[in-house]
Structures are given as C-alpha cells and as structure tokens.
Regions:
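Serine-hydrolase catalytic machinery in alpha/beta-hydrolase-like enzymes
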Residues: 6-99, 111, 145, 179
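Short beta-strand immediately N-terminal to the catalytic nucleophile in serine-hydrolase-like folds
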Residues: 99-104, 127
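Gly/Ala-rich beta-loop-alpha elbow adjacent to hydrolase catalytic centers
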Residues: 104-112
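Hydrolases whose catalytic domains are alpha/beta-hydrolase-1, hotdog thioesterase
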Residues: 111-115, 135
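A conserved short beta-strand
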Residues: 120-133
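Short beta-strand/loop motif that positions the catalytic acidic residue
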Residues: 152, 158-160
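Conserved alpha/beta-hydrolase "acid-adjacent" motif
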Residues: 165-170
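Catalytic histidine-centered segment of alpha/beta-hydrolase-like enzymes
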Residues: 182-195
Length: 205
C-alpha cells in the first residue's frame, strides 16, 4: 500500500487529499471529515482500514477551510463546490479508471450526499449522518436533513450510533442503516461499523 498527500486547488482555496492506495484496487473511496473535526477521526480511520481489507483504495479529504486553519465551515455551497473539484482531480489521477464510492462523517456525509450524482459515484457511505440538529431553547424548530438522503439514488450505507443526538435516519429502498453502540462520535461502535461496512462493500464493489 502507498500513502501520499497532495494539495488540490479549488475555487475556495487549497484542499488536501491523503491517499492510501492498495495494490490492484477494486474501487476507490473518497471520504470527507466532519464540520469541526479532521481526517483522523476514529470512524474515518476504521472505515479506511476496512476498505483496504476489501481491496478499496481510500482518499481522505481535508476541506480548504481546515487546510487554512479555520475551525468553522463555510456555507454548504462552498463545501460542495470544493468537494467536486477535489473528486474530479482524484478521478483524473489517483483513482483514475476505478469504480468510485464517496462518503464522510457528519457534515462530510451531507456534502457527499448532495454531490453524489454530480461526481458520478456508484455508492455512498454516511457515518453519523446529522439527521436533525438538536433543538434550541428559542427560535424555529430544527429542520430534518432527511431530504438530502432521500434524493440519493445509489446504494447507501448509513452507520449511526444508537444514542446519536441528531437521531437515526430510516432505512429506504436503496439505503441500509446500521445502528451501532454509542453516540455521534461512533467511538463505541467501531466494531459494528467495520462489520456493516465489510458486508456492504462485498455487495457494492
């Protein structure tokens, strides 16, 4: 396996792609991080290791705002545009000619959902999808992000902690939901994540 990192220019600054490529890959997966976290989140690393075991190369993507040292993400449209630029670059280089899978954790899962068809991905992985923001003491009630998941037409795996404060999405015609121990961090559910992802990869790759 080879591990490299390179910066990729996007309309909103430089992103960073951390590639972990297996020999004779069966597919390539691109994963994004959460809003306030990075590519070293435990669930992303567990997903990477499991993907390698199934012959899938993985690229972990740092959005431009994280590369620039900012903690708060920009508007969704900027995240989506930067993500599309990164995936396009990867498809012309590290993942050229491979069946493409995309995904991420939390905010990164939402970005992958919204852009899955635009980048031509064959399947989608959502770790800790933030379904409904926790209610605030004042202001309007939170809005569900379920329409983002429902708009996806490719096979989808959602891995969600049973105590996730954002809730648990329902399964759908092409959407499998694996509920594992733990909360939004998925730290207590890594074994379940690996099992669910391994089974799913055996079907979609």
């Amino acid at each position: 396996m080879s591990a490299t990192a390179r910066e990729i220019d996007t309309p909103y600054g430089l992103a960073r792609a951390h590639s972990q490529l297996v020999e004779r890959p069966r597919a390539g997966m691109v994963l994004g991080h959460g809003a306030g976290g990075g590519v070293t989140a435990r669930d992303l690393l567990a997903a990477t290791e499991t993907s390698h075991e199934h012959g899938v190369s993985v690229v972990l993507v740092e959005q431009p705002y994280r590369v620039a040292g900012r903690k708060s993400p920009p508007p969704a449209a900027q995240l989506d545009t930067a993500w599309r630029a990164v995936v396009e670059s990867l498809r012309g280089d590290e993942l050229s000619g491979l069946r493409l899978l995309v995904g991420g954790r939390s905010s990164g899962a939402r970005v992958a959902c919204r852009t899955v068809e635009a980048v031509g991905a064959a399947a989608l992985l959502c770790l800790a999808f933030p379904l409904v923001p926790p209610a605030r003491r004042s202001g309007p009630p939170p809005v569900s992000r379920l329409p983002e998941l429902d708009a996806v037409s490719v096979p989808t795996l959602v891995v969600q902690g049973e105590n996730d404060r954002f809730g648990i999405p329902p399964a759908g015609p092409r959407r499998r939901v694996a509920v594992v121990p733990g909360d939004h961090s998925l730290r207590s559910g890594l074994a379940g994540l690996r099992t669910a992802l391994g089974e799913w990869l055996g079907e979609v790759v």
